[in-house]
């Protein structure tokens, strides 16, 4: 029987598909049982993020087709972190699961999917990475509006590692977090953090020109966002960092 393929996609700021990072480090730990295809030709850019995601989606689709068409007996798994989780989530939701999807013919060969810090996380669907951060609460979901749905009904297994306090992967459905979703939408489309009408700062100013009754929730969302990004310099204490070893063990269960 053919070795299964593992496709991995790095997060923002990690364009080297072979470099250090959760997906690649996880793959290196299971090379005895998987063939590994890291996704390159993908800038993993912070700004503008959505075009970067689209390039990652196109490359992941291409590599899945190339590898699985060449070996009709090979199963496969996918793993993505942060922006890479969006790439994997987009391919899964829009190209593998729909009967009309370009990759739907491979659905029965998909065995495992791993996400860390997933902005497309399905509400209430979260797993512990057995580390220092608590797992996301049952009433939380990913920050993007285009989220995964009904993952429990499919034949493949999923681990969606999400921490409480990870703004990308764990928000609630209330007024404050509605603005965090809007901030997430801004990050996807913005040309940069500051400078120009399409920067994050300019778009936040525009978002702030809302009725005064909405001001408290908006201010809270902006404070949450700025606090979250500031904590990225805190090392392991940043909730958007994850422990890979439960994912390694999960992949080994084949």
Swiss-Prot record:
The active site is at 82, 166, 240. It comes from the Viruses. The keyword Hydrolase applies. Changing residue 82 to A: Complete loss of mycolylarabinogalactan esterase activity. Disulfide bonds: none annotated. GO terms for biological process: defense response to bacterium; viral release from host cell by cytolysis. One of its GO terms (molecular function) is hydrolase activity. InterPro entries: AB_hydrolase_fold, Cutinase/axe, Lysin_B_C_ter. Keywords: Antimicrobial, Bacteriolytic enzyme, Cytolysis, Host cell lysis by virus, Hydrolase, Viral release from host cell. It is an enzyme of class 3 (hydrolase). The keyword Hydrolase applies. It holds the Pfam family Cutinase. Its EC number is 3.1.-.-. Endolysin that degrades the junction between mycolic acid and peptidoglycans in the host cell wall and participates with the holin protein in the sequential events which lead to the programmed host cell lysis releasing the mature viral particles. Once the holin has permeabilized the host cell membrane, the endolysin can reach the periplasm and break down the mycolic acid-rich outer membrane. Cleaves the ester linkage joining the mycolic acid-rich outer membrane to arabinogalactan, releasing free mycolic acids. Belongs to the L5likevirus endolysin B protein family. This is Endolysin B. It comes from Mycobacterium phage D29 (Mycobacteriophage D29). The gene is 12.
């Amino acid at each position: 029987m053919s070795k299964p393929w593992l496709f991995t996609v790095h997060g923002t700021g990690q364009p080297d598909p072979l470099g250090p990072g959760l997906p690649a480090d996880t793959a290196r730990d299971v090379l005895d049982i998987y063939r590994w295809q890291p996704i390159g030709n993908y800038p993993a850019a912070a700004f503008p993020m959505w075009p970067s995601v689209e390039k990652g989606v196109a490359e992941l689709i291409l590599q899945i087709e190339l590898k699985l068409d060449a070996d009709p007996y090979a199963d496969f798994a996918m793993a993505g972190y942060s922006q890479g989780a969006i790439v994997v989530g987009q391919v899964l939701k829009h190209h593998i699961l729909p009967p009309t999807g370009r990759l739907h013919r491979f659905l029965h060969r998909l065995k495992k999917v791993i996400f860390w810090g997933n902005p497309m996380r399905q509400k209430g669907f979260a797993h512990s990475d057995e580390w220092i951060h608590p797992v996301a609460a049952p009433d939380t979901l990913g920050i993007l509006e285009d989220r995964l749905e009904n993952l429990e009904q499919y034949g493949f297994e999923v681990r969606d590692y999400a921490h409480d306090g990870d703004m990308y992967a764990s928000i609630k459905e209330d007024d404050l977090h509605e603005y965090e979703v809007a901030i997430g939408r801004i990050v996807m489309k913005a040309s940069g953090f500051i400078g120009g009408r399409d920067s994050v700062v300019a778009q936040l100013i525009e978002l702030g020109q809302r009725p005064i009754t909405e001001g408290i929730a908006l201010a809270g969302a902006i404070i949450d966002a700025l606090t979250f990004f500031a904590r990225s310099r805190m090392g392991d204490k940043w909730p958007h960092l994850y422990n890979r070893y439960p994912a390694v063990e999960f992949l080994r269960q084949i």
